[in-house]
From Swiss-Prot:
Pfam families: Globin. It comes from Casuarina glauca. Its EC number is 1.7.2.-. Residues 2-151 form the Globin domain. SUPFAM superfamilies: Globin-like (SSF46458). GO terms for molecular function: heme binding; metal ion binding; oxidoreductase activity; oxygen binding; oxygen carrier activity. A motif (Homodimerization) lies at residues 35-39, 105-117. It catalyses: Fe(III)-heme b-[protein] + nitric oxide + H2O = Fe(II)-heme b-[protein] + nitrite + 2 H(+). This is Anaerobic nitrite reductase SYMA. Binds 1 heme group per subunit. It is an enzyme of class 1 (oxidoreductase). Root nodules. CDD domains: class1-2_nsHbs_Lbs. Transmembrane segments: none annotated.
Length: 152
């Protein structure tokens, strides 16, 4: 289902807030992932030996920022482009990595919950159910693209 103009506006409005602190929000995203599913730390080599989010870990900072920025930027472009706009190599890499790490629906759901929680905390009083629905729809579309690549 295509995003509406209103959903796109909500995504872009919240992205303006989020991109002011990508390092902080991306670390918060990972903290919420680990909080919701502690076993997920074993998917990330730089978290395997840690009981908490090591905020000064350069590998975590870099990886978290890339993931957070990729999700958010891709989400804000969905309506305009009509689909996730990743080049073929990026899409193949995303499919391959998720397949290799045996990422399944529950993992994607944990990520979605963490993403929504991070956004809600960041935008504070501007959060609404409508904004949450817009991010949920965008995230689901991005995940569907990755899952399709995982099957190939």
């Amino acid at each position: 289902m295509a995003l509406t103009e209103r959903q796109e506006a909500l995504l872009k409005q919240s992205w303006e807030v989020l991109k002011q602190n990508i390092p902080g929000h991306s670390l918060r995203l990972f903290a919420l992932i680990i909080e919701a599913a502690p076993e997920s730390k074993y998917v990330f080599s730089f978290l395997k030996d840690s009981n908490e989010i090591p905020e000064n870990n350069p590998k975590l900072k870099a990886h978290a920022a890339v993931i957070f920025k990729t999700i958010c930027e891709s989400a804000t472009e969905l309506r305009q482009k009509g689909q996730a706009v990743w080049d073929n190599n990026t899409l193949k890499r995303l499919g391959s990595i998720h397949l290799k790490n045996k990422i399944t629906d529950p993992h994607f759901e944990v990520m979605k919950g963490a993403l929504l929680g991070t956004i809600k905390e960041a935008v504070k009083e501007n959060w609404s159910d409508e904004m949450g629905c817009a991010w949920t729809e965008a995230y689901n579309q991005l995940v569907a693209t990755i899952k399709a690549e995982m099957k190939e």
